[in-house]
C-alpha cells in the first residue's frame, strides 16, 4: 500500500493530494481561501476587542451577542484554513501574515461606548460580508463557494444584528 508523499512536485506549487480539481482552480481557491482566513482572523480579534472594552446601555446583551459571533467566525476561519490544506496549499494564519494582508481598517482602541463599537464593527462586518459575497461568484471550486456562502449568510445576519442595535 502506498502512501501520499507530503512533498511538492517539481511541476507544482501544491502539496500532493489525490483531489483531482484542476491545479489552476486549486491555486485560485487557495488564494481566495487564505484571503478569507486573514479577514476572519482579523474580524475575530476585532470582535473580541469590542467585547472586552465596551461600556454603556445594552452592554451585557451586546457583549454576549459578540461572543456568539466570534465563535461562528472562528469556525468559518477553521473551515477555510482546512480547505486550503485539502487542496494542497498552506493555510496562512499567523499574526504577522494577518497584519501584513488584512484589508480591514485598523480598529480604534480609544473608543468605549457600546454605540461607538457597534458602528466600528458594522463597518468591518459589512466590508467582510461584501467581500466574501463577491468571492462566492469568483471562485470556481464549488465546495469553496459553498463554504463562502455559509459564511456569507452568517455575516449578513451578524451585520443585521449589529445595525439593529445602533441608535
Curated annotation (Swiss-Prot):
Q: Which InterPro entries match?
A: DPS_DNA-bd (IPR002177), DPS_DNA-bd_CS (IPR023188), Dps_gammaproteobac (IPR023067), Ferritin-like (IPR012347), Ferritin-like_SF (IPR009078), Ferritin_DPS_dom (IPR008331)
Query: Which positions are annotated as binding Fe cation?
Result: 51, 78, 82
Alphabetical keyword list:
Cytoplasm, DNA condensation, DNA-binding, Iron, Iron storage, Metal-binding, Oxidoreductase
Q: What are its GO cellular component terms?
A: cytoplasm
List where the protein spans the membrane. Answer: none
For whether the record's keyword set contains Membrane, the answer is no
User: Where does it primarily localize?
Assistant: cytoplasm
Looking at the record's lineage, which domain of life comes first?
A: Bacteria
Could you tell me where this protein is found in the cell? Cytoplasm
Function according to Swiss-Prot or TrEMBL: During stationary phase, binds the chromosome non-specifically, forming a highly ordered and stable dps-DNA co-crystal within which chromosomal DNA is condensed and protected from diverse damages. It protects DNA from oxidative damage by sequestering intracellular Fe(2+) ion and storing it in the form of Fe(3+) oxyhydroxide mineral, which can be released after reduction. One hydrogen peroxide oxidizes two Fe(2+) ions, which prevents hydroxyl radical production by the Fenton reaction.
Task: Share what the entry says about its subunit structure, partners included.
Answer: Homododecamer. The 12 subunits form a hollow sphere into which the mineral iron core of up to 500 Fe(3+) can be deposited.
Q: To which protein family does this belong? A: Belongs to the Dps family.
> What name does UniProt use for this protein?
DNA protection during starvation protein
Q: Which organism's genome codes for this protein?
A: Serratia marcescens
Q: Which gene encodes it?
A: dps
Amino acid at each position: 500500500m502506498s502512501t501520499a508523499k507530503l512533498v511538492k512536485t517539481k511541476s507544482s506549487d501544491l502539496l500532493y493530494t489525490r483531489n483531482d480539481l484542476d491545479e489552476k482552480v486549486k491555486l485560485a481557491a487557495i488564494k481566495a481561501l487564505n484571503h478569507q482566513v486573514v479577514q476572519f482572523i482579523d474580524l475575530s480579534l476585532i470582535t473580541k476587542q469590542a467585547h472586552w472594552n465596551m461600556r454603556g446601555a445594552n452592554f451585557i446583551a451586546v457583549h454576549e451577542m459578540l461572543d456568539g459571533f466570534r465563535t461562528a467566525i472562528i469556525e468559518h476561519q477553521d473551515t477555510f484554513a482546512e480547505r486550503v490544506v485539502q487542496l494542497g496549499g498552506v493555510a496562512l494564519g499567523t499574526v504577522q501574515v494577518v497584519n501584513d494582508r488584512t484589508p480591514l481598517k485598523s480598529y480604534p482602541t480609544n473608543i468605549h461606548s457600546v454605540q461607538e463599537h457597534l458602528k466600528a464593527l458594522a463597518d468591518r462586518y459589512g466590508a467582510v460580508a461584501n467581500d466574501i459575497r463577491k468571492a462566492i461568484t469568483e471562485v470556481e471550486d464549488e465546495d469553496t463557494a459553498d463554504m463562502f456562502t455559509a459564511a456569507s449568510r452568517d455575516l449578513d445576519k451578524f451585520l443585521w444584528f449589529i445595525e439593529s442595535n445602533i441608535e
